[in-house]
Every structure is written in structure tokens, then in C-alpha cells.
UniProtKB/Swiss-Prot annotation:
Belongs to the SurE nucleotidase family. It catalyses: a ribonucleoside 5'-phosphate + H2O = a ribonucleoside + phosphate. Its EC number is 3.1.3.5. Gene3D superfamilies: Survival protein SurE-like phosphatase/nucleotidase. It holds the Pfam family SurE. Its cofactor is a divalent metal cation. One of its GO terms (cellular component) is cytoplasm. The gene is surE. Keywords: Cytoplasm, Hydrolase, Metal-binding, Nucleotide-binding. A divalent metal cation binds at D8, D9, S39, N91. This is 5'-nucleotidase SurE.
Amino acid sequence: MHIMVTNDDGIQAPGIQALASALRVLGEVTVVAPDRERSAVGHALTLNSPLRVFELRDGFYAVDGTPTDCVNMGIHSLLPFRPDLIVSGINHGANLGDDVTYSGTVAAAIEATLMGIPAIAVSLATQERSGHFPEAAQIAVRVARQVLSNGLPEDTFLNVNVPDCPAEEIRPPLVTRQGKRSFVGNVIDKTDPRGRKYYWIGSGEADFNDYEGTDFHAINRKHVSITPLHLDLTNYASMKVITTWVF
């Protein structure tokens, strides 16, 4: 088995190091990841500037681009084989609910899915500098083993979130639906010493709906959350209503 690993926290992040090491029990692992942190870049693809690749050591490639760039570089240029699985992570911080629309970690799994390769996005629900990444890596191995054995439905990947706690405290995985997060006041404006305005985005408070069956509900109770996500964003129920409109 050939497995490619990427992330959005950068190739030196502890999460990707733990993940790559753990996945070697399943087969050959190649890491193709951003050369620095690229969190919250979404599904960005670099089209207007060249990309550079640095081989840090055997099987570890740093790309000066986004997670989506890394998937493309790995599949079309760097890997001598088409991977059987692409695993993105382990992200430093949860990717729950609406977070997935911003996440570079999830975007890498989306890109792999677009290319017809089974994919998993893995995140650790922590804000601590040193979270339980080895424990999350072992969860990733268990999920990866199932995907390699059973495959995934077409246009579907798995978004896995792991609670940040010792292995003995992690409760059994739950298959969940995507929850809903709401952000309040997440833009702050400041003035620099020269009197010019500048802004910070993302520093506001975030709330979420803790509904049973959601990824939030599972993580808050120390369960592993496994959410199958698919690429077809069509709202089929709304199609019937909108077809009655007069354009």
C-alpha cells in the first residue's frame, strides 16, 4: 500500500510527524506538505506563481504552496506511484461544522477525492501547543485501515476529529453529521503608529449548536467524530422550489 500524507500546519508540525510515523504500519508513506503554516487557506490553488519543492529527507517533500498544491504536486510530479490513500493532518485544532469550508486540511482531502483517491482529513480538537498527537495518530491508523479495506462511496471522504485526551479517555468513534458554528464579532480594527488602519480577522468568539448526532456533540463528550462528507453541494430539495420561479 502507498499512502501520501499532507497537512496545512506545515511539514515540521508535530501532527504530521506523528501521523506519518504511525501510518507506516499500513504501507509506504510519502509526505508532501507546505513548507510553512497554511491554516485556513481553504481550497486555494496556486496558478499565478511557480512552486518550489525541497526534499528535506527521503520521502519528505516541502512545497512552498497550499495543501491543494501539495496534493497536485505529489500525485502529478513527486510520487512514482498513484497513492492508495491520502491522509491530511493531524491538524492542530478541530475542524468541525462550518470550519470545513475554511480548512486547508479538509481541502487537501477534497482535492484527493476530486482525483478519485480515497482520502481522510484528521484533526485534533486542541488549542494546546503539545496535544495528544500520538493518540490521534493511532485513531487515524484505525480509520485508514478500514478505508483501505472497504473503500469509500464515490465523491466521499471522511472528516475525522479526535478529542485531546489520553488514549484511555477517548470514547468509541461515532459516525456524525456536520454541525453548525456561528461567529460573533470576528473582525477587529486597529491603528498602527503611522495612523493607518489594519484589521485582524478570526479573533472573535465562536459558538456552536450542541445537537445530538453532530460532530460537536461527539467531540464535547470525548468521542471520536467521523463525518462522511461529499463533494456534491447541490440542495436537491430546493431545486423543486426554485424551478417554479420565473426568471
